[in-house]
Design a protein with these regions (language model features):
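The two-metal-ion catalytic cores of nucleic-acid processing enzymes
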Residues: 1-229
Length: 230
């Protein structure tokens, strides 16, 4: 069985640039692996597996990406209005206690909606950023129906339209970093950490911040091994 890559470990270091053709994608919150992990310990993670240009199997544990979506807000709103809304959402009965503090931050941006005729007008949106995908989905549910917040809209119910909420966090990260699902990526030397002990059966096992991954154009096909049985 020596021909199996997993049985031929390499003495890995972070002294070299790595180019990897992606074979597989996985994503998870830390809580999915250990139910005791909550709060700041419950982060969103992505695992990329692939083959590098030296034919080594590689597992890339990607950290630091925060799921987010947008809601449309009135054009006269300031950050203080969004703060009131965010605090009300954290206390909403639909939010499980484990996610109440996982709405990490928010900001106001101006964008042009993709749908509908708006001429060239720009509209205000609140960008809500979350610690993990569990909170990302939980907070969406609040906005799927009219919401009443005492200090907003005179205490009357208001429907906040969701935008880009259907884009899963892993796909969002791929788009942000311009990565193709089965394409090539580059990670520069010193930008990643070699996991010791390894977290996988791959020959190269590393952890890297998502901002250090770059999608690249490359026509070569990695030396991928396919296994099957009758």
């Amino acid at each position: 069985m020596d021909y199996l890559r997993g049985n031929n470990k390499v003495d890995a270091s972070n002294e070299e640039d790595i180019e990897i053709q992606i074979v597989g994608w996985h994503n998870y919150d830390d809580h999915e692996l250990d139910e005791e992990l909550t709060g700041e310990d419950n982060e969103f993670n992505v695992l990329i597996t692939g083959i590098d240009s030296l034919k080594r199997s590689v597992a890339v544990y990607v950290e630091g990406f925060k799921p987010f979506f947008f809601i449309q807000i009135p054009n006269d709103w300031k950050k203080s209005h969004v703060s009131i809304l965010a605090e009300a959402c954290k206390k909403h009965y639909m939010i499980d206690e484990m996610y109440c503090e996982d709405l990490e931050k928010f900001s106001i941006v101006k964008r042009k909606p993709f749908y509908g005729y708006t001429h060239d007008d720009m509209f205000k949106f609140a960008k809500l950023v979350f610690r993990n995908k569990g909170a990302f989905h939980a907070y969406q549910n609040i906005f799927r129906r009219p919401l009443r917040v005492r200090d907003l809209f005179g205490g009357q119910e208001h429907y906040y339209e969701l935008f880009e909420s259907s884009v899963e966090p892993m796909l969002r990260m791929m788009h942000v970093r311009d990565i193709q699902a089965s394409g090539w990526i580059r990670i520069c030397a010193k930008d990643y950490h070699v996991n010791k002990p390894s977290l996988s059966n791959c020959q190269y096992d590393i952890t890297v911040p998502y901002k250090k991954i770059v999608g690249i154009k490359k026509d070569a096909v990695g030396d991928i091994v396919f296994a099957g049985f009758d």
